[in-house]
Amino acid sequence: EAFQGEVYMNLHTIDKADVENEAKIINFNSTDIELPPNKIPTLTRDFRATEKMNIFQLFSHSHEKTVEFRVEIAGGNRDGELLYISYDWEHPPVMKFDPPLVVKRGETIRLKATYDNWTDETVTFGLRSTDEMMILFGAYYAD
């Protein structure tokens, strides 16, 4: 049975002269997900910063088989530095950073997700909660 929903949004504007920084969206994701049956695999994906990122918000998106979602710096002096972690796929924390978390141009952000595929089927990327995802959303501004 079809139903119609409604969504409302309030947009607040300011004068262009009052803008200090223009926010950009973080959308780091991987569709290359293949979880073998009855296993607990950890997948990693790396994303290199193409500009200096002053990150002021991060949150993960994944589905029901996710048991841990970590975001770290990979390589260099900050190797292994934890930026974000979630153990709750349904209600991931939205982390806000003030002052912003700085990731320099050329540094690598690593997504590391651990899944528990308790089923007898291989699970892949997909839109249903019984499929899986590995996405990092957030917001930043560049210098």
Regions found by a protein language model. Name each.
Residues 1-143:
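Beta-strand-centric surfaces of beta-sandwich/beta-rich domains
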